[in-house]
Amino acid sequence: MTAKVLDGKATAAAIKEELRGRVAALAERGRTPGLGTLLVGEDAGSQKYVAGKHRDCAEVGIESIQRELPADATEEQILDVVRELNEDPACTGYIVQLPLPKHVDTQKVLEAIDPDKDADGLHPMNLGRLVASVGGELDSPLPCTPAGCVELLRHHGVELAGKHVLVIGRGVTIGRPAGLVLTRREVNATVTLAHTGTTNLDELLASADVVIAAAGSAHMVTPEQVKEGVIVLDVGVSRVTGEDGKSRVLGDVDPAVKEKAAWMAPNPGGVGPMTRVMLLANVVEAAERAADGENWAGERAGA
């Protein structure tokens, strides 16, 4: 068996096409979604990632609002920009690019974001709403990577209801919120959360129908550990220096796992494009909610 590819690039392209239509519909209502980014410092990886987000915006018609500060910016200067983006009506959603400099209280900055403009879906209030809402409509953004995993599988016709999903990793961006997204009634998976300190990982991998590897530990999931027909999404990223002295980026899953898997999301090209497109979806949905709110307020005023 050789795994079929869960193609994140093609799936993201299809979702972008749908988003273009929604952005056009918003334009007819006199509203244009705007994605803001706040980048502190000159980290090359962060600069590249932010630039990619704004290229994505241009593809679907979302306005780009870019704010940059030097690495030695004070916490108060950063918070000033956060407040500015909170108040800017052109900005319907934004992200603070992480990591922030060590002298900055990252949690304080993230909590200062207006929850209605939280494009990453990671504000404590929005995570709390996700905890409290098991089913039905959720009028707050979902965390981008877990939502991207679900959409990637859905677009390939892979059913998650009733399946045992093993999530490896306990980070706030993927591992911890993944269980909340996957156990919503509309998805209905059964989730086990493991991490690098889990002592029975081999046992859990052997029984998992789906594996989402997001621990940031290079090639920690091997063919010997998984069962035939498993569905694997490789989300982890590790930078490893080889014997030749060159640095390369590796995922959490040994590529040889594809010989046992039914479906596999490669790294890169699998979940990464989905994370970025779900960010766009959150921004568009925020603009739609704001436009609907304005219409409701107008109707009330005219009543």
Curated annotation (Swiss-Prot):
It comes from the Bacteria. GO terms for biological process: L-histidine biosynthetic process; methionine biosynthetic process; purine nucleotide biosynthetic process; tetrahydrofolate interconversion. One of its GO terms (cellular component) is cytosol. Keywords: Amino-acid biosynthesis, Histidine biosynthesis, Hydrolase, Methionine biosynthesis, Multifunctional enzyme, NADP, One-carbon metabolism, Oxidoreductase, Purine biosynthesis. GO terms for molecular function: methenyltetrahydrofolate cyclohydrolase activity; methylenetetrahydrofolate dehydrogenase (NADP+) activity. NADP(+) binds at G169, R170, G171, T196, V237. Its EC number is 1.5.1.5, 3.5.4.9. It catalyses: (6R)-5,10-methylene-5,6,7,8-tetrahydrofolate + NADP(+) = (6R)-5,10-methenyltetrahydrofolate + NADPH; (6R)-5,10-methenyltetrahydrofolate + H2O = (6R)-10-formyltetrahydrofolate + H(+). The keyword NADP applies. Pathway: One-carbon metabolism; tetrahydrofolate interconversion. Belongs to the tetrahydrofolate dehydrogenase/cyclohydrolase family. Catalyzes the oxidation of 5,10-methylenetetrahydrofolate to 5,10-methenyltetrahydrofolate and then the hydrolysis of 5,10-methenyltetrahydrofolate to 10-formyltetrahydrofolate. Homodimer. This is Bifunctional protein FolD. It comes from Micrococcus luteus (strain ATCC 4698 / DSM 20030 / JCM 1464 / CCM 169 / CCUG 5858 / IAM 1056 / NBRC 3333 / NCIMB 9278 / NCTC 2665 / VKM Ac-2230).
